[in-house]
Amino acid sequence: MEAVTLSEARVYVGTYNKYNSGSLFGKWLDLSDYSDKDEFMEACRELHKDDQDPEFMFQDYENIPEALISESWLSEKFFELRDAIEKLSETEQEAFFVWCDHHNSDISEEDADDLISSFEDEYQGEYKDEEDYAYEIVEECYDLPKFAKTYFDYSAFARDLFITDYWMDNGFVFRCA
């Protein structure tokens, strides 16, 4: 999945009426300017107040996962999720969406705080490879003498860790739930 930064989400808002009449008139709206979906929809209505009953068309968007938007729909959960992940670093936000993809989490339906909590329980960090993570586990959890560490098979240990207890994607390591 391409890196997504919800705080920088934007939507190009037009209407089906204008589009079907040959006009692509619309405007990019930054979702960071709105606290919730109602406020965003009010801005859409104001933008297209010349349409009697505008049917909004989200013709393009940036920094919004496809699970949260389509041409004619923006999830109610977008604003909740955007606000919930603000406490995560940029790297953690990227890892969060990798984790969501792996778990097939329906971010348009699930509670944002529950998703973040589950993610934080499983996320271990970013590593260059599985062996790099195994090396850290040995350093933190095992009191091996320096002599023994030179003979330790980190590759085999990493293989064993990632067979059952951990998984890695795009450099992000997660504990299996």
Annotate each PLM feature:
Residues 31-34, 127-128, 151:
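Conserved aromatic
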Residues 39-43, 80, 95, 111-114, ...:
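Exposed alpha-helical structural elements
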